Amino acid sequence: MKEPFTNASYFPPVETALVDPNGLLAIGGDLSQERLLDAYRHGIFPWFNPREPIQWWSPDPRMVLPPAEIRVTRSLAKRLRNAGFELRVDSAFIEVMRACGAPREGAWGTWISAPMIAAYGRLFDAGYAHSIETWRDGRLVGGLYGVAIGRMFYGESMFSREPDASKVALVRLARQLERWGFGLIDCQMETPHLASMGARPIPRADFTARLAELVNLPHLPGPWTFDS
């Protein structure tokens, strides 16, 4: 049986996180399954560059997307219907992580290092981490990955090798999570891309209060299968 959310944690209270840089809460520790799950249950996530110590964050405000509020433009709706994409779930988790971590034009390095891939691979094996994948003609062309606890989904990263391929994955995820009774998708930090799809910032205090409810709802362990 899953242990209930409590105030006991490896981490200091999120209210003590720095204002500048926004949300930096702690440095150090490890990427064990126990510590990662504890972090997520308290609204904390790891984010650090290679060769840096592990850094743990809880920014204020927090970017969230209620699944029922996913925004689908007319052009994206057309892509969902007619682009010839195939959706798969939890079939290529490590491949999705590696694609998300691949160097991108205009970006220096990547925070999705080999230790991160190994750590989240263990979460996947334990049924907590998930990949939502967009395929075309047997090729992985986009997708995202994240962590689910109770009825809370924490989005981590997404990638596209074709236009809108990651958006298609996010829309399908949001629609399925709504059917399953998930309350929020955590988007961590504000970006124009996520805002265009309905995500919005909320105060950290509101986020952690809602989080405390959602992580204690019945857990759906992976691998997942979406409704057709």
Curated annotation (Swiss-Prot):
Q: Which reaction does it catalyse?
A: N-terminal L-lysyl-[protein] + L-leucyl-tRNA(Leu) = N-terminal L-leucyl-L-lysyl-[protein] + tRNA(Leu) + H(+); N-terminal L-arginyl-[protein] + L-leucyl-tRNA(Leu) = N-terminal L-leucyl-L-arginyl-[protein] + tRNA(Leu) + H(+); L-phenylalanyl-tRNA(Phe) + an N-terminal L-alpha-aminoacyl-[protein] = an N-terminal L-phenylalanyl-L-alpha-aminoacyl-[protein] + tRNA(Phe)
Gene Ontology CC entries for this record:
cytoplasm
The main enzyme category here is transferase
The protein's superkingdom reads: Bacteria
Q: Which residues form the signal peptide?
A: none
Give the EC number(s) listed in the UniProt record. Answer: 2.3.2.6
Its keywords, alphabetically, are: Acyltransferase, Cytoplasm, Transferase
Mind telling me which SUPFAM superfamilies this protein's record contains? Acyl-CoA N-acyltransferases (Nat)
Q: Name one GO molecular function term.
A: leucyl-tRNA--protein transferase activity
Subcellular location(s): the record lists: Cytoplasm
Whether Cytoplasm counts among this entry's keywords is: yes
Transferase found in the keyword field: yes
Cite a single GO BP annotation: protein catabolic process
Q: What does this protein do?
A: Functions in the N-end rule pathway of protein degradation where it conjugates Leu, Phe and, less efficiently, Met from aminoacyl-tRNAs to the N-termini of proteins containing an N-terminal arginine or lysine.
What family does this chain come from, according to its entry? Belongs to the L/F-transferase family.
Q: What is this protein called?
A: Leucyl/phenylalanyl-tRNA--protein transferase
Gene name, Swiss-Prot/TrEMBL: aat
